[in-house]
Amino acid sequence: MLIPRRVKHRKQHHPKRSGMSKGGTQVAFGEYGIQALTPAYVTNRQIESARIAMTRHIKRGGKVWINIYPDRPLTKKPAETRMGSGKGSPEWWIANVKPGRVMFELSYPNEKIAREALTRAAHKLPMKCRIVRREAGES
């Protein structure tokens, strides 16, 4: 699973989910990609689950790129704890995904199998997604 090796601060503020993605909105490496349509926090477990769903469907002959990284900690207080007495301990690592961001890319010779693999991966993610294809003019 994806987690940072070292962090400067163990606990951070929650990232803002408003606005559109500033970069990473086009397919850059593969032929097809999964693009976010709504904002969400994507955990490292969800990223890994989507990656496994894709790679198991395409078996061999394809390549997968993951364009998001869970570098923000989310904290949680224990159950049945009264309010106050500090912030909770880090529970998850999340990637803050904004609309328009291409999260996963896939290169595979058969378009039908590639689209099915990306659809399976999109079902594992906590937001609305669409499958995008590299434009003819893009390098």
UniProtKB/Swiss-Prot annotation:
Kindly list the biological process annotations in GO that this record carries: translation
| Pfam families xrefs | Ribosomal_L16
Under the heading InterPro entries, the entry gives: Ribosomal_uL16, Ribosomal_uL16_bact-type, Ribosomal_uL16_CS, Ribosomal_uL16_dom, Ribosomal_uL16_sf
Per UniProt, the keywords (alphabetical) are: Ribonucleoprotein, Ribosomal protein, RNA-binding, rRNA-binding, tRNA-binding
The superkingdom listed in its UniProt entry is Bacteria
Instruction: Give the span(s) annotated as Disordered.
Output: 1-25
Q: GO cellular component terms?
A: cytosolic large ribosomal subunit
UniProt function note = Binds 23S rRNA and is also seen to make contacts with the A and possibly P site tRNAs.
User: Subunit details for this protein?
Assistant: Part of the 50S ribosomal subunit.
Protein's UniProt name = Large ribosomal subunit protein uL16
Q: Coding gene?
A: rplP
